[in-house]
Amino acid sequence: MKKLLIILFTLSFSLLASAQMDSVRHEARYWAERGYFNKSLEALRQLPYDSLTVSDLRLRYDNFANLGNIDSLFYWGDQILKRDPYNIPLILDYTPRLNRGKVSDLGKRVTYPEKVIDICQKYRERDTTHILVNRQLAEAYFNMGNYDLAMPALKKLEAVGDTCFGTLYTLGLTYQRMGDYNSAYDYLSRATVLRNDEHGWCLFNLGIVCNKIGFGAEALSYLEMAKERLMPDRRTLFRMHKELAEAFRMKGENDFRLEELQECMRLADEKDVNELTYEMGQCYFILKQRDKAEELFRKFLDTSENKEYNDKIKSMRESAQQQLRMMMW
């Protein structure tokens, strides 16, 4: 009788614990589905580690993916594959992230091709025909710089009909790295057509290849298109230099501030010129280059005199006039 009671008590406790964990899992999914990824993680942390299912691990992985926490995402991706190395939905999400990598603290992009190769080769023990897995394997070989392995992997993809942009582009880059510029030209040309000449780096590499094989006119065309797509537009560059100038002003580094303002002037619209002229005059005044400061302050006052101006320009005019008077003392 005593043994029976112990068994019943243990069973009741297990059922209660199971029900509680199911409730926690439901809560975690509820929060994740509504975009509350940190709340979902808080719920999952209530589950003992040895009770976590693969689905629990995947929910953690997805939460960290949505939060942009790459290090934690990598950790939970590895935990899932330790339990289930053939988990194809996870592999198809995880390996592209590993191939893209992350930006290190030093600002350099770090990729993990060796890990991708291990994951893909393990999966290929069961299935060697999965195009999406084989793409990531080929990409990993390329990222390692092992073009002798990347090339046959990519050619096998092409042979089974995988002629998407990524495969053609990586084939073109691989031929380029191997010095076969005619083949590189063929594949990069096909790749850029698929992207309607909108992929800047494809155009850039195609321009380089055209130069290598003596197609100067084509090289100019592709490189000009690459420049348009890779360079920020003029107003974006103007804003960037303007913000750099402001940062140098706050640091008190007016020589560098002046350089940035000169870049702004080169990119400026007419409406920006008066304010820039005043700010450059300020820099020269602080740097004790009085002749240049006076010239710019007078120019600013002349060009803004007969125009409608707001409180900011009015304040600048008063400041310029005051600084001119100071220079006369």
Where are these regions (language model features)?
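Canonical tetratricopeptide repeat
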Residues: 59, 93-94, 132, 136, ...
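N-terminal leader/linker segments that initiate helical-solenoid repeat arrays
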Residues: 17-75, 82-93, 99-103, 110-111, ...
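Start-of-helix register in tetratricopeptide repeats
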Residues: 22, 55, 89, 132, ...
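Terminal, low-structured helical/coil segments at or just beyond the last alpha-helical repeat
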Residues: 286, 291-329
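Register position in tetratricopeptide repeats
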Residues: 33, 66-67, 100-102, 143, ...
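TPR-repeat structural position
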Residues: 37, 70, 104-106, 113, ...
